[in-house]
């Protein structure tokens, strides 16, 4: 399972919380964008957030409505992202795509998810491994 972190949907967290009948006491979260986590199961929501006592570069992925309730009440994690859907692959499909160089792999960086504006995440992730996206060809293969 994978989660896309740079594709905002046209809905805000307020819409999701209202749909789930969760009271909002933390007004600052109403306009938080909801992300498209992937094309599969878009009726399923996920919250990626820091732990209560954050360890360097560790996050929790939770499908819990209770996590959203805590966030809405101002008692939840301060750094979080909410998404609907996920990316999924059949057995062996991801490995095949990796072997065909269809993916560029970068190390996880929690600050990329929580601190970088959504529209800059792709470029910043590529920069973590020394890529300049503007110089990348749209053709893949083996040299």
Label the model's feature ranges.
Residues 1-83, 87-143:
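A short aromatic-anchored loop/beta-hairpin motif
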